[in-house]
Amino acid sequence: MESQRNLLLLALLFVSFLLYTAWVEEKTPQVAPQVQTEQVDSSVPASVASSANSANLSDGVPNSPQQSSTDATSTELPASQSVTIANDELRLTISLVGGDIIKADLLQHDATLDSDTPYRLLDSGNGFTYIAQSGLIGQGPDANKNGRPLYDTTDTESVLADGQAEVSTMLHFVDADGNIFIKTFTLKRGEYVTNVAYQIENKTDSPLNVQLYAQLRETLSDDSGSMVMPVYRGGAFSTTETRYEKYSFSDMQDGPLQKTTEGGWVAMLQHYFVSAWIPSPTDQNVLYSNIIQDKEAAIGFKAPSKTIAPQSVAELETNLWVGPKIQEEMALVAKNLDLTVDYGWLWFIAQPLFKLLLFFQGIVGNWGVAIILITFTVKGALYPLTKAQYTSMAKMRLLQPKIKELREQFGEDRQKVSKAMMELYKKEKVNPLGGCFPILLQMPIFIALYWSLMESVELRHAPFMLWIQDLSVQDPYYILPILMGVSMFFIQKMSPTTVQDPMQQKVMQFMPVIFTFFFLWFPAGLVLYWLMSNVVTLIQQTLIYRSFEKKGLHQKEKEPVVLTKK
């Protein structure tokens, strides 16, 4: 029950946590291209290509995002077949074929640290696809068996000007019956939301039935990060019954998503960033997923069908979030969208810790200093538990001579030894597990803080000081992990022990080295937290032991006396 044994327990719990995380990633089937037994022409709608599964809710949604009746083979559009729209947060490239968003640059987020290139979340080309597709099926232009509609526009580039609140770009298409379809994209200042609106003018003498759909398409990927930095890349959705649930690429391969819900949303997630289609919260929407030619995964929604009377005009719209996982902003855009910042099963601890971290950062303006302040706060709040832990261990050490006498008295009779020890603990008012409970209670807090730092896009490219210019990646010179290992070594040296087993002694001696090795690849922000936690532990340990010395509960370790023969 000594301090070093508790340190070993903490280490084992932490390593077990990492191994469990790695096991979860390993047990999740990795996505690999499957052998195609039949080549499906990309020009046919999904309803034809997936005829083997007539219940698939993605029926009617086109498979090919780029294809039009005028250009059925191109995957890289010339500049004349795309337009751009930008506000102060986003720059979108929109294909005139179907009006899909084929590129999205996040202007406030660098691709790499201190680069002049913005982070590109959506992209198309070079063998990779991650796009936001939307259209009108039923009797709409996107259901044409000859391909997607080729829109016309007078706006080649629309940029939010100074003093403007929003910027829009309009695409026009007229079908063979003379029906007019206007697709408008609108960006507001300071927002990551794109409003996609349709104006449909029925020029015929017959009713026109159309159905709005929107989906996110991404090349199948097995990028799951590393053991210490596990990340999720795949789909997710929300319904009235399920607030938030991941739907991975392997889930989509096992079977399509099929949900009907009021409102809801569908999304594609990756580390720090998310794209999500958000339909009308009052419509009964169909959420679906699809695997396209064993190469791409799609997750999307279909709104209810709408009938437009002859010689009438109707409007439909949806919203698209393309941006970082900023909880406060996402919560305002759609219900439960902020849950894409996934803190795991300890979210109820991680959420307030993150809010506290935000509070400190708002005061000091430095995320590294905010981590130090939250460390002081957490360790201060846990000080009563820490003191109780050391008090229990000190009392256990004082009982060691009596426990030794009991073992000598009863010999190999373990039952009598255990009974006598329980009576001794009761008499001396000592809980033999008192040194373990506090450390077990502290571990969930560390894990919760681990996930809150891991999931926080705010720490991406956030500097601390000196050589630490990005708290979301490892220390480039490994200085923090080494200092953390040194601090663990001093904690060991200050902790009295009665461990006699040579194997346990060797394990304890190597724990600082093992932890240092693990932390070499940890984000600098996490290592900073652990280092400062150890520093505070050393201070608390010193103060507690001094108070124990006055009460006779602690004595400084003496060097062993070595007897030599003369």
Curated annotation (Swiss-Prot):
Keyword Protein transport among UniProt keywords: yes
Transmembrane parts of this sequence: 6-26, 356-376, 433-453, 471-491, 510-530
Region called Disordered, residue ranges: 30-80
GO cellular component terms given for this protein: plasma membrane
Compositionally skewed regions (Low complexity) per UniProt: 42-58
Polar residues: compositionally biased ranges: 31-41, 61-80
Biological process annotations from GO: protein insertion into membrane; protein transport
Keywords: Cell inner membrane, Cell membrane, Chaperone, Membrane, Protein transport, Transmembrane, Transmembrane helix, Transport
A single GO molecular function term of this UniProt record: membrane insertase activity
Subunit (UniProt): Interacts with the Sec translocase complex via SecD. Specifically interacts with transmembrane segments of nascent integral membrane proteins during membrane integration.
Similarity comment: Belongs to the OXA1/ALB3/YidC family. Type 1 subfamily.
Stated role: Required for the insertion and/or proper folding and/or complex formation of integral membrane proteins into the membrane. Involved in integration of membrane proteins that insert both dependently and independently of the Sec translocase complex, as well as at least some lipoproteins. Aids folding of multispanning membrane proteins.
Protein name according to UniProt: Membrane protein insertase YidC
Protein source organism: Psychromonas ingrahamii (strain DSM 17664 / CCUG 51855 / 37)
